[in-house]
Structure formats: C-alpha cells, structure tokens
C-alpha cells in the first residue's frame, strides 16, 4: 500500500516537472538570464486591482495585477511594455 502511494507521487511529480520545466527553459537566455518578455502573465497573490500590461509573445495586453507577487512581465503602461519587449 505504501509503495503504491510512493509510486503515484513520483509519477505525479514527474508529470508536473515535464509540464513546468520546458516553460521555464523557454524564458531563459543562453547565459542563464530570464527573458521577462517570455514569462506568462501572473496576476500575483493579492486581491487588489491594478490594470497592468504584459507581453504575450506578440503584443502587449492588459491584465489585472493583484499588487503582490507575480513575475517581471508586468508594466505600468502599454508604451513601457512595447519599449521593453517588442522586437524592431
């Protein structure tokens, strides 16, 4: 009974890593720096309401930021987002 639970936990963890790890790698430069423009939108942990902008891979899009946490793909204006993330 204990072995079956352990194997299920290992399988679940393996699947979770297979899904999460490629997304993290795709946001990383060859020198190890993270390209914030490739990170997904993240509204953070709080329940406040701030309209912010994130780069979705093509353009800058509005989203609601909760005020705490999240990631660095978050800009106060569309102009700031485009300046940082849009490719010329």
Curated annotation (Swiss-Prot):
Where does the protein principally reside? secreted
Q: Which GO terms describe its molecular function?
A: potassium channel regulator activity; serine-type endopeptidase inhibitor activity; toxin activity
- Show the propeptide residue ranges: 28-33
Looking up InterPro entries in the UniProt record yields: Kunitz_BPTI (IPR002223), Kunitz_BPTI_sf (IPR036880), TFPI/VKTCI-like (IPR050098)
Which residue positions does UniProt flag as site: May bind Kv1? 39
Tell me which tissues or organs this protein is expressed in.
Expressed by the venom gland.
The intrachain disulfides are: 37-85, 60-81
Identify the CDD domains for this entry.
Answer: Kunitz_huwentoxin
The record ties this protein, via Gene3D superfamilies, to: Pancreatic trypsin inhibitor Kunitz domain (4.10.410.10)
Q: Which GO terms describe its cellular component?
A: extracellular space
Q: Where in the cell is it found?
A: Secreted
The BPTI/Kunitz inhibitor domain extends over 37-85
Q: Which UniProt keywords apply?
A: Disulfide bond, Protease inhibitor, Secreted, Serine protease inhibitor, Signal
Output the GO biological process annotations, alphabetical, semicolon-separated: envenomation resulting in negative regulation of voltage-gated potassium channel activity in another organism
Coiled-coil annotation reads none
Sites annotated Reactive bond for chymotrypsin: 47-48
Against SMART domains, the record matches this protein to: KU
The signal peptide annotation in the UniProt record is 1-27
Write out the function statement from the record: Serine protease inhibitor that inhibits trypsin at a molar ratio of 1:1.
Give the UniProt family note. Belongs to the venom Kunitz-type family. 03 (sub-Kunitz) subfamily.
The entry's protein name is Kunitz-type U15-theraphotoxin-Hhn1a
């Amino acid at each position: 009974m204990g072995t079956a639970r352990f194997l299920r936990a290992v399988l679940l963890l393996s699947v979770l890593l297979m899904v999460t790890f490629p997304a993290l790698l795709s946001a990383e430069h060859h020198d190890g720096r993270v390209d914030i423009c490739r990170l997904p939108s993240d509204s953070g942990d709080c329940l406040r309401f701030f309209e912010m902008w994130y780069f979705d891979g093509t353009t800058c899009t509005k989203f609601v930021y909760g005020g705490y946490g999240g990631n660095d793909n978050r800009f106060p204006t569309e102009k700031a987002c485009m300046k940082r993330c849009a490719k010329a």
